[in-house]
């Protein structure tokens, strides 16, 4: 993915003139201090806030300000606001996990009357939900349980499952471990790394936790003042990242 001159109008975030190249198949981290723009980048690209500039993926221009067109281009997003954006709290795990893929890709639907009518494939929906309940160790009473009734960590796992079910080629994940316990954090990070390795999916992980980024990312970009201050290998010393975070970007 190539990002050029990206700006985003998101309250509490500064994003102006972001230029960034993401390598196919890598896990790229984006870090930085609060309000400096790291959260605005994925929210702007995925159409949740007004944005401008140029974003290309696999040689195709990605239309900004259109969440549906981003999904059609095989992009997916796990938002930092899991209760406000990520989940249908009063719906079942099955509906949360399967609905986006049904709506965008017509997955988990059975055709009738030569395709004139499509109806939910309940067996397939249950199967995909159970697959992710098992793989992500989602603690629940079953696939029919409502998302509202789960703990924060398990809600986050459902958000991941929803994105995984889309089988994207490129995945943005914003603050994936925020507000969840230590054990659940590691499972979420392991799931992201496994998804990347087994499916060749490019992952961009945005996080306030530098050490979490360093644990699974190949490279880490630091955002300061709404721009990319620098990109370093994840193995570089923490002090180098700290210097970028407080740097004045010209």
Give the positions of each predicted feature.
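Glycine-rich phosphate-binding loops of nucleotide-dependent enzymes
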Residues: 1-250
